From Swiss-Prot:
Low complexity bias spans: 54-64, 82-93
Expression (tissue specificity): Expressed in the retina.
Biased amino acid composition, Basic and acidic residues: 430-441
Coiled coil regions, renumbered to chain: 162-234
Protein name listed in UniProt: Protein FAM161A
Predominant location: cytoplasm
Keywords, in A-Z order: Cell projection, Cilium, Cilium biogenesis/degradation, Coiled coil, Cytoplasm, Cytoskeleton, Isopeptide bond, Ubl conjugation
Biased composition (Basic residues): 327-337, 398-407
Family from the record: Belongs to the FAM161 family.
Length: 475
């Protein structure tokens, strides 16, 4: 936005405002003149009527009555005619117009003019004291008393002119304020449009001078040390036994590798199968098993024998009957079978001499008829064996030596006779075996740790020429 355009537009606005003000003042003056003429005509007509009615009144009273409205006319016209022409001039200017307007009433107008001209003759303020109580109170209310000047008037500016002057001053001040506000707003807009982007703080500011010097000196020292080391290495002659030391190191490493491979191959643990005697029943179960086994072998033979044997005589039947038992009624059809208890007891004894060794399959079949307490013990034993195998499988590492055989268990158990049962593992034997296993694991762990430490020492040990160079650098 250009300020010159604003300035020209403001000038044009004020110029038009002044033109309008001049036109307004002209119209207001015309209106004021017309208003005064109207007021004068009304006052003159009222005085003429009063003079016609009072025929026998005295001349002094008529003069006072006529002068009183004239004064009222002046009093009415004074507040509106501040700064204008005097009352006499206005009346002189207005009378010719009245004569033109009312030619039939020329005598009345002449009489009124004479009254106006002789109005100030024998004038005294005391004559109006008794009549003008209201005007006196109104004068007291005024801020400043006005002196009675019949012919000379003090020019006082109109309120409208004062108001216009104040408006002009306010407009000028408002214009200056508007210009300053516009300038300030433009400056603020220009400042707001600017984008401040601060540059990062340079790194040299954060580092003090002393640290820079120390860093530079350290770099120079390192460069000098590297230069001296390169010169010494260039001037160093290799010894004759360097190749021999390298060969020894290669042979040593090869031996270690072969040793580790052999240990990995030989030390792999392989669990042996559980011996069959563990699954055999206990010694307390053997009589029961033998009895069941004998019954199972004898029953078919007894049945075959009973079926093929002839029927016994009546005397034999009477022998087996209990005399104390009540007599049973004889029916048409009799049972032709023997009592089970007596027959079995009778025929069981001759076949007891058939005793022979039991095969493993029959032994396993008889194990199905064992007592629940023995089966629980056997299940616990098998669970312990499986747990030991799982622990060994978890803790086993390639290259370890096999676990030492426990005294309680042997890989090749001696054949025991059929009559004796294997010893059952107790809590103390289990604790002993666990302690042995723990000690073996600890010893193997220590052994492998020692081997690793030796390897680290061998790898970290410098060669002879390296030690010589270190001695040279230190010297």
């Amino acid at each position: 936005m250009n300020f010159s355009d604003i300035y020209h537009s403001d000038e044009e606005y004020f110029r038009k405002l002044k033109d309008l003000k001049a036109v307004h003042e002209e119209t207001m003056s015309k209106l004021e003149k017309m208003y005064q003429d109207k007021l004068n005509i009304k006052d003159i007509q009222a005085g003429f009527i009063r003079d016609g009615i009072s025929d026998s009144s005295s001349s002094s009273a008529s003069e006072k009555s006529c002068s009183h409205p004239a004064l009222s006319v002046t009093s009415l016209s004074e507040p509106d005619l501040d700064g204008s022409s005097s009352l006499s001039t206005t009346t002189d200017e207005g009378l010719p117009d009245l004569e033109e307007k009312t030619p039939g009433e020329s005598s009345a107008m002449v009489h009124a003019q004479e009254l106006i001209n002789n109005m100030w003759n024998d004038f005294s303020v005391e004559d109006y004291i008794q009549y003008d109580s209201d005007s006196r109170t109104a004068k007291k209310k005024r801020k400043k008393a006005k002196s009675l000047t019949p012919k000379i008037t003090v020019p006082v500016p109109f309120e409208m002119t004062v108001r216009e002057q104040n408006r002009r001053e306010k407009a000028l001040s408002a214009r200056s304020d508007l210009e300053t506000k516009l300038l300030k707003r433009d400056e603020d807009d220009a400042e707001c449009k600017k984008k401040f982007r601060a540059n990062p703080v340079p790194s040299c500011v954060l580092l003090p001078l002393y640290e820079d010097l120390v860093k530079q000196s350290e770099e120079r020292r390192k460069k000098a040390r590297e230069r001296n080391r390169a010169a010494l290495l260039a001037s160093l002659k290799p010894f004759k036994f360097i190749a021999r030391e390298e060969q020894k190191q290669a042979v040593r490493e090869k031996k270690l590798r072969d040793l580790f491979r052999a240990k990995r191959k030989t030390n792999q643990f392989k669990a042996k199968p559980v011996p069959r005697f563990i699954y055999r029943p206990a010694a307390s179960d053997k009589p029961k098993e033998e009895e069941l086994y004998g019954d199972s072998r004898m029953l078919p033979k007894v049945r075959d024998l009973l079926q093929n044997s002839p029927w016994p005589s009546r005397s034999a039947c009477r022998r087996f009957r209990d005399p104390r038992s009540p007599a049973k009624p004889r029916g048409k059809h009799r049972r032709r079978c023997l009592r089970r208890d007596g027959d079995l007891e009778k025929w069981k004894e001759p076949f007891s001499e058939y005793s022979f060794l039991k095969c493993p399959m029959l032994c396993e079949e008889c194990c199905l008829h064992e007592s629940p307490c023995d089966s629980d013990k056997r299940q616990k034993l098998l669970a312990d064996i499986r747990a030991d195998e799982e622990i060994l499988r978890e803790t086993r590492r390639p290259g370890r030596s096999p676990r030492r055989k426990s005294p309680g268990r042997s890989s090749n158990p001696k054949p025991r006779p059929h009559e004796c049962s294997p010893p059952m593992p107790t809590a103390s034997s289990r604790g002993r075996e666990q302690a042995i296993r723990r000690s073996e694991k600890a010893r193997m762990r220590e052994y492998w740790q020692e081997l690793e430490e030796q390897e680290e020492k061998l790898q970290k040990r410098p060669m002879l020429f390296e030690r010589v160079t270190q001695v040279v650098f230190i010297g």
